[in-house]
Amino acid sequence: MSEYSIFTSESVSEGHPDKMADQISDAILDAIIKDDPNARVAVETLVKTGMAVIAGEVRTNTYVDLEDIVRSVILDIGYNSSDVGFDGASCAVLNAIGKQSGDIAMGVDEASEKDLGAGDQGLMFGYATNETDVLMPAPIYYSHRLVERQAYLRKNSILPWLRPDAKSQVTLRYENGKPVAVEAVVLSTQHTPDVKQSDIREAVMEEIIKHVLPEEWLHSNTQYHINPTGQFIIGGPVGDCGLTGRKIIVDTYGGMARHGGGAFSGKDPSKVDRSAAYAGRYVAKNIVASGLAAKCEIQVSYAIGVSEPTSISVNTFGTGKISDDKIATLVREHFDLRPRGLIDMLDLKRPIYRPTASYGHFGRTGDSFSWERTDKADALRAAAGI
């Protein structure tokens, strides 16, 4: 991967229709896994004008009120009246959830707990870089913080004319592999009909952009695009249909690292699309935190029903203190990347998933985000002899 001199990433708010769908899917997963940690869950959501549809496959011994969960998530996000364009209290909720296929269950379950088979084939990537304190790429990190700030101002009525739907985009200039300046910022936010565009631009600039982005990165040639098409009154599921799993680059590294293609939300941890991507982040972050490399990307792959990964690869893009092959050997020695091993390593059978469904799965803080720990860094450093 060559060095970029300019790089752009984007994020979307919790009120974006695709993120609404992700949050509904993960709220359902949380409700089920809270009472049945061994449940198998794969839930997809679609939201469109006046309607939410949930579909997928579930195997569980517990009961949850799916309609109530759907409505609660929509209302919590802020879609609570026809004035906003969508009302969680009155929208239709259609349920098309069925049972998990017996063929899939056989491949995953008919092994010992230690040798739990992967829920599907696939390839997953994890990534970390030392360009931010949380070891995330700066463009996606700051894109998340912009829309997170928009939601804070909206929910606390600091800017009461804000509505739930919003998008951000940050373009950074790099020198010697480090971000040094903001070249462009895009912030589009839904709003009430009665606010002036000039007031929106001023408030977004002062309360969101300047509040979030490092002052020293802003310069006289920075481009600011605030609601560049003009008014943004119609948004959310009225403006666009929302689907689970349609913001996989927003969910991960903003395009800075490769992606295996599998989405996360609505999937229990037996699905390696999710759990192995989390483990990949954990591995890469510990490698960077240990000082073994300034940036690291790990790829891991699986076959359905097989516990051992079919491959583990490491790329430090020329920043490694030791060879990538030696780091890959350390990964195999210090991390159990079998499905059961990584579930136990990261304690993934918990109701921790809805918070991941907005503002990124990585670079977050708090006990729920166990894949963000750097508790293996010292052991890796010692084993590498650096």
From Swiss-Prot:
Keyword Nucleotide-binding: yes
Pathway: Amino-acid biosynthesis; S-adenosyl-L-methionine biosynthesis; S-adenosyl-L-methionine from L-methionine: step 1/1
Ligand binding (ATP): H16, D165, A166, K167, D240, R246, K247, A263, K267
Keywords: ATP-binding, Cytoplasm, Magnesium, Metal-binding, Nucleotide-binding, One-carbon metabolism, Potassium, Transferase
Record GO terms (molecular function): ATP binding; magnesium ion binding; methionine adenosyltransferase activity
EC number of this enzyme: 2.5.1.6
Annotated positions binding K(+): E44
Top EC class, one word: transferase
One Gene Ontology cellular component annotation held by this UniProt entry: cytoplasm
Keyword Repressor carried by entry: no
Compartment(s) where it occurs, according to its Swiss-Prot or TrEMBL record: Cytoplasm
Cofactor: record remark: Binds 2 divalent ions per subunit. Binds 1 potassium ion per subunit.
Xref: PROSITE patterns: ADOMET_SYNTHASE_1, ADOMET_SYNTHASE_2
Cofactor(s) this protein requires: Mg(2+); K(+)
InterPro entries (UniProt xref): ADOMET_SYNTHASE_CS, S-AdoMet_synt_C, S-AdoMet_synt_central, S-AdoMet_synt_N, S-AdoMet_synthetase, S-AdoMet_synthetase_sfam
Function field: Catalyzes the formation of S-adenosylmethionine (AdoMet) from methionine and ATP. The overall synthetic reaction is composed of two sequential steps, AdoMet formation and the subsequent tripolyphosphate hydrolysis which occurs prior to release of AdoMet from the enzyme.
Quaternary structure, from the entry: Homotetramer; dimer of dimers.
Family the UniProt entry places it in: Belongs to the AdoMet synthase family.
NCBIfam families tied to this protein: metK
Protein name in the entry: S-adenosylmethionine synthase
Lineage: Bacteria, Pseudomonadati, Pseudomonadota, Gammaproteobacteria, Oceanospirillales
